[in-house]
Amino acid sequence: MIKNDFNQPKGSTIGVLKDGRTIQEAFDSLGYLGVAVLSPANYGAKGDGKADDTIPLRQCVQDACALGGRVVGTVGAEYKISGTIAGTVGDGKYVELDFTGSKFVPTTDDAVMTITGVATSPVAEVTVEVVSVNLGNGSTNTIAMKVTAPGGHSFTKKGEIGKAWSPVLCLNNDLSTQYAGEPFVVGLVESSTVFYTTSVFTELYMGTSLKVIRVPTTQVVVKGLDVESEWTTGWKASTLTLSGLLRPFVYKPKCKNINGPFVNLTGCYGATVFLPEGDNLRNAPSEGAYGYFVNDSASFGSTIYGINCTNARHAYTTSSPRSEPTDDKWWLKGRTLFSEITNGLGTGCHNAFDTHSPSYGIKFTNCRAVGDFRGVDTGGAGFQIRGDRSSLVDCTAINSKIGAAFTAVNISGNSELYISGFTYEGPAGHLALSLSGKAGQVNRVTISDSRWKTLEQYATAITNVEVSASNVEAVVDSATTASAAWRIGEGATLRTRGGAARFSAGSGHSVISLAASGAKVDVGDLEVTGSSFMQYLLATLSQYAGDVYIEADLDGAIPGNPVGGGGTDLKAAVVYTAGNKFRRPLAYRALTIGNANGNTLGLNYSGHDVITWEITATVAGANVNGITPGAFIGQQLNIGSSPASTQQLIINNGTNIAMGHAVTLEAGRGVTLYWNGANWRSGSV
């Protein structure tokens, strides 16, 4: 090894530098530059694209992992591989695998390379409790976890990173083999049996058989890994897997025509993948072949920068590895947490950017998905979010079957998604946003400063999700009759402020399409253009009901009643301006009663606080003896006899009316009723 050639006897001045250091000391101070530099050629690798270089490459990489060293491939070499190049790295080692300018060609269905970190510290069985403790020099105590290891633990100082795991299933698991496990940072070491951490993971696993270990301080760098294969039926092996490593770094990896996942991060902490590039990853789930370009599995805080991927199942995805409840394979425990994917591009994928149910806190920033399609077992979403507390920031989807899909159906607990600056554009048959929650859970989506444009009948579909939106612009260019900016399904809640709904083709459109009963809609300060293509503000069917409030500024009038359809329990308060005229069309009705029969009148779905009816009585005995139920307790109904009435108007006790006595109104007189939850009562005459 290079640096060993410069070892000097103690006290020797041979090879002493100007600053007094020996060459040996200079190498040591340079860290990784002072490790062994190994060449596959020195181990017998030909790199000629003909010979099988598996054995020499494997030995070269294993030596580097065992000793701590740097492997440098030959520029222009083509290494044929017929088996896995596997290495294990212990604590404190630095390993760099630099294959820049060379290429790997797999000839069998085997992983190309796997590097696994090996913890030299022992596994400790622990118990935990929530305490208040001072973890620094401040005067304020911190709520923390006191971790007690009766048999001793291996932590020595604040800031060390550990992993805890338990035989209980991880939160929001989607497989019965996904067991709990989360990393933590040591805040204080009190003794050889007690330490503290501010991580709250332990609250989830109290009372279980909890174990901890110190994560190995191994450094692994992989540079320029370039793998090219051919699609082969039955092949499914992964290409590169890094497991149980602290801050591994993968620099400019590249693949083409491979048969399974490319880069797998399994149980790593703070991994970085920089500028990965991939084309044509085969996706055949029936054969166990999954075209995952970057698979972030049970890792913590990964940074994936500059993905450029074409034709894969996922350009990025999370997953949880399979393990046994009582084994100590800590790197296979837990779910993916707090990873960030930045400046990514996925084109022609099945779902470009994806998270599975157990993931938490995954953030996509400035990522673009173009032309995602429905593939095998996938839904064609540019962004498919199935975890909790994920976020999309300044992301774009173009011509994807679904721009962004939030699916909480398989999540066992509550979940949230945050969307800011999202842009979508797609043709007919493609949906901008699909938000699907699970009945009985709280699933929330917060959207801000976003815009989508579609030729599809509906721009956004919501089911069992609470949506809060601000400054969202929905452009519906659909020529299909009765399209809508928002389609509200079962168990959905929509609250918007600001933004716009724009229509430019077709007819009979509406801002809201109510597709189920029980939904709640609160739309405020909405700009609406293309009102000439509209029929209603709210459209629904006669069997559906819900609570709806719409406040909008239209660029022109819409015909007739702003509510189309609706059951008797539908409650709608609509306020809008059109042509500089302010209107509350459901709050006022001009009616005529021209018969002496008992007349039951409907509120016309109005959910306004105050409703006014002006009734013209034209025959003797004209009367009202029934009114549909009020929308809420305290709702007020003013009934006036029009000055144009030629006869008295009689308000009788009857269906939902309990005034104590009938009220007779002369022309120009009125009565005020209020809803007490059971009947309309007289407030004044």
Swiss-Prot record:
GO terms classed as biological process: adhesion receptor-mediated virion attachment to host cell; symbiont entry into host cell via disruption of host cell envelope; symbiont entry into host cell via disruption of host cell glycocalyx
Gene Ontology cellular component terms for the protein in this record: virus tail
Location of this chain's protein in the cell: Virion
InterPro entries found in the cross-reference section: Pectin_lyas_fold
Superkingdom of the organism of origin: Viruses
Annotated keywords: Degradation of host capsule during virus entry, Degradation of host cell envelope components during virus entry, Host-virus interaction, Viral attachment to host adhesion receptor, Viral attachment to host cell, Viral tail protein, Virion, Virus entry into host cell
Subunit structure: Homotrimer. Interacts (via N-terminus) with depolymerase 1 (via N-terminus); this interaction probably gives rise to a branched tailspike.
Family statement: In the N-terminal section; belongs to the Przondovirus depolymerase 2 family.
Function of the protein: Functions as a receptor binding protein (RBP) and probably mediates the attachment to the host capsular exopolysaccharides. Displays a depolymerase activity that specifically degrades the K5-type polysaccharides of Klebsiella pneumoniae capsule, which allows the phage to reach the host cell membrane and bind the entry receptor.
Name listed for the protein in its UniProt record: Depolymerase 2, capsule K5-specific
